[in-house]
């Protein structure tokens, strides 16, 4: 049994781990790196056609985004995930493929003018559809036998609809070991989702560390904080533009906006419009409403039982076409614009930033993690000017942060989840975090008596004697 850490080692995006067992190759996630050129993603150490199966923790692009490329390169195995993840990933991967095709076409036109060869997309919509055809749903709590010597179980980890921690039982040459992959550990007390479930025991644990070096601000009333931002912007005639992940964060924000509008909390602006400018978010929102209710926390279940739609509010308008999107900027009223991508590196949000960053009355509200190298991180870091679509745009708008909406547990939350194991793991491998976060969480675990390492890409774990022993 051998495990190779491929992606998200000392970085947040590009999650991918290779498990080799009894002559078969298995992947845990195949995510896309963000904040770098997509063609610079870390290659697999094995051929795609030699991968027997993939186990997907959740549908976010940094965990699932290279599955269509895997299919394009020859993978024809099964992709195991929860039913909600299967549905969301299908939507997200087709959207990602559309982006790949559009960007490749734009680069090709530019290359042709320079007398250079055309640029091929990383993958196409057909590749995304092919990958989606490989999905095999596994329900929470169901122990599934994949092959002789390999069983898995998915448990709710509270990060995204359908997100899971995955337990693996591995048997080879008479030796059985258990390894747990945390996936992205959710924050507690978030709208819509359940809190992360604990796991009883494991020999080895691979745990994320996105916020392994920091604590979230003291719990705040997120609804009140969002209300205050809306009030401040609207009172001075501005709008609130929110770059939001189309899947997960957008639905949480719609949940909060429904409550705000129902209670008429923004004084003097009861009828403010809310524009959801993301075809992906619109489709993902439909998936949310079709899922089993056990995916939702008790509060959301209660809203559903009352006959209400928990993520719809009066004044909500979907912008599906490019014309719909452009029309938003012709609406002079104070408004909310929700658009993807959440890190501002792609999608329609970039058009809205171009039209709104230079207006001092507006607020750009950051409501999620921003990786190094992304436009979202640059805005957080106080950049005074950005380049969008060939133009230099002054950053005059207020840049604000919505606290308490993180989909990731902080250092305390991560440690509490690890501490909930009834039996201490033999070794903990810390990944999915910037170097500072990885090493800080590793140090905390070591201080508390755990054996913890923060592997780099390419590092190996042998869970049984290697040929060298």
PLM features: residue spans?
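Metallo-beta-lactamase
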Residues: 96-160, 292-332
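Catalytic core of the metallo-beta-lactamase
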Residues: 21, 138-197
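Hard-cation-handling environments
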Residues: 229-240, 244-367
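Pre-active-site segment of Zn-dependent metallo-hydrolases
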Residues: 9-12, 21-77, 81-133, 185-195, ...
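Cap/insert and terminal regions of metallo-dependent hydrolase folds
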Residues: 165, 186-277, 363-368, 385-451
């Amino acid at each position: 049994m051998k495990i190779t850490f491929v992606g998200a080692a000392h970085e947040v995006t590009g999650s991918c781990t290779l498990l080799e067992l009894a002559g078969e190759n298995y992947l845990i996630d195949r995510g896309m790196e963000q904040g770098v050129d997509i063609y610079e993603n870390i290659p697999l150490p094995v051929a795609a056609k030699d991968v027997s199966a993939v186990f997907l923790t959740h549908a976010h692009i940094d965990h699932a985004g290279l599955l269509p490329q895997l299919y394009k390169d020859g993978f024809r195995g099964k992709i195991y995930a929860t039913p909600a993840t299967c549905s969301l990933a299908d939507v997200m991967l087709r959207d990602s493929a559309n982006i790949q095709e559009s960007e490749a076409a734009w680069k090709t036109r530019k290359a042709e003018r320079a007398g250079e060869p055309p640029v091929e997309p990383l993958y196409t919509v057909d590749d995304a559809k092919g990958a989606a055809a490989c999905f095999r749903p596994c329900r929470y709590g169901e122990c599934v036998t994949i092959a002789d010597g390999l069983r898995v179980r998915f448990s709710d980890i509270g990060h995204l609809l359908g997100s899971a921690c995955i337990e693996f039982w591995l048997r080879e040459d008479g030796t059985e070991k258990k390894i747990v992959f945390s996936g992205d550990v959710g924050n507690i007390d978030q709208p819509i989702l359940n809190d992360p479930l604990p796991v009883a025991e494991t020999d080895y644990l691979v745990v994320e560390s996105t916020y392994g070096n920091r604590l979230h601000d003291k719990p705040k009333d997120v609804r009140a904080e969002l209300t205050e931002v809306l009030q401040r912007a609207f009172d001075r005639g501005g709008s609130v533009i929110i770059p939001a992940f189309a899947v997960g964060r957008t639905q949480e924000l719609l949940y909060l906006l429904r409550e705000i509008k129902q209670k008429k909390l923004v004084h003097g602006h009861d009828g403010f419009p809310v524009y959801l400018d993301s075809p992906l978010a619109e489709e993902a929102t439909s998936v949310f409403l079709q899922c089993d209710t056990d995916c939702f926390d008790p509060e959301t279940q209660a809203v559903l039982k009352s006959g209400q739609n928990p993520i719809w509010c009066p004044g909500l308008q979907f912008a599906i076409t490019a014309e719909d999107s452009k029309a938003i900027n012709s609406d002079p009223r104070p408004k909310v614009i929700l658009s993807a991508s959440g890190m501002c590196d792609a999608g329609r949000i970039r058009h809205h930033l171009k039209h709104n960053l230079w207006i001092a009355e507006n607020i750009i509200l950051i409501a999620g993690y921003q990786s190094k190298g992304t436009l979202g991180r640059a805005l957080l870091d106080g950049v005074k000017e950005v380049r969008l679509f060939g133009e230099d745009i002054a950053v005059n708008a207020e840049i604000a942060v919505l606290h308490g909406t993180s989909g990731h547990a902080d250092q305390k939350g991560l440690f509490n989840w690890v501490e909930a194991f009834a039996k201490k793991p033999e070794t903990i491998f810390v990944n999915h975090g910037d170097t500072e976060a990885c090493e800080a969480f590793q140090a905390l675990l070591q201080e508390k008596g755990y054996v913890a390492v923060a592997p780099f890409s390419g590092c190996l774990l042998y869970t049984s004697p290697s040929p060298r022993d």
